[in-house]
Amino acid sequence: MRDDEFEWDDRKAARNLRHHAVSFELARLAFADPRAIDRLDLDESDEDRMLLTGLVGDVLLTICFTERGSRKRIISARRASQREKTEYSEQNT
């Protein structure tokens, strides 16, 4: 995983860190989880967004992102909800 595979808005990253206590630098590591699951984000948006749930250390994170060419643009990152934890567990057993 290379740093140039990811991009984000620095102001949004700072807000996300304050609100969810998850940095985008940490969040990008979830993409390296070979058992990570991704799905289309069905929230209404003017762009196609994806959700990825992956393990970073012992913390399960959910990242909202979009693909821009060969790069992933991180939009938000947070600890996975109970439903997302269950889905991750079921997909990986």
What are these regions (language model features)?
Residues 1-93:
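Ribonuclease/tRNase effector modules and their secretory precursors
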